[in-house]
Amino acid sequence: MRLGKPKGGISRSSSQGKVYENQRKTGRQRQRWGMTVRFDSSLRRLRRGLDEKPYKCVECEKSFSQSSTLFQHQKIHTGKKSHKCADCGKSFFQSSNLIQHRRVHTGEKPYRCDECGERFKQSSNLIQHQRIHTGEKPYQCDECGRCFSQSSHLIQHQRTHTGEKPYQCSECGKCFSQSSHLRQHTKVHEEEKPRKTRGRSLRAKTHSLSSWKAGKGRRSAAGLR
């Protein structure tokens, strides 16, 4: 008895057993690297796992695993920011960046911590916050082994080993390893400016008074003659 063609447009080759295809939207499958994987999202994940990046940028030769990622990257070279905020007019390369920016205007905080209920505008901020509860410190210093919950804290710490001081005071040229230390330092200059201004004003007033007295004395002497 001859069997009819299976539903869903599936074609099989029992002799080879290599290719399995399902033309329905949810089901295209192929056998690769000794395993059967979903052709859409699973294959893209497998490509990333194997570091396969077939899509290359002609401008900088940077490679990507997905064509959509390459398309977004190319906007950096063209300078085209096609996603514009209707509230302030600021433009962005990617729609996801515009969505994040819009939360500045709306105040929306869609990411909620299950432990304490605090909300955040970005998922990355929530992930960093959750490490307060879990105690996770995934960033380790290669020099001393000290661990940190945020990569920015590790970068700041590493400057204690390298001696790097990238933040320079525009007033006196003094350098600092952290931006917070520079901000504290600039307050010293801000406090000095009013004192200098008051000092200059006092000297100017004293000089004017002395000049006035001297002039008055000369006029009096001339009158006596």
UniProtKB/Swiss-Prot annotation:
GO cellular component: nucleoplasm
Compartment annotation: Nucleus
ZnF region ranges: C2H2-type: 55-77, 83-105, 111-133, 139-161, 167-189
Keyword Transcription regulation appears in the UniProt entry: yes
Keyword terms: Acetylation, DNA-binding, Metal-binding, Nucleus, Repeat, Transcription, Transcription regulation, Zinc, Zinc-finger
Residue span of region Disordered: 1-35, 183-225
A Pfam family assignment: zf-C2H2
Compositionally biased spans, kind Basic residues: 195-206
Residues the record lists as N6-acetyllysine modifications: K18
Recorded GO MF terms: DNA binding; zinc ion binding
Main localisation: nucleus
Family: Belongs to the krueppel C2H2-type zinc-finger protein family.
Listed PANTHER family: ODD-SKIPPED - RELATED, ZINC FINGER PROTEIN 208-LIKE
Job of this protein: Binds DNA through the consensus sequence 5'-CAATG-3'. May be involved in transcriptional regulation and may play a role in tooth formation.
Protein name: Zinc finger protein 22
Gene that this sequence comes from: ZNF22
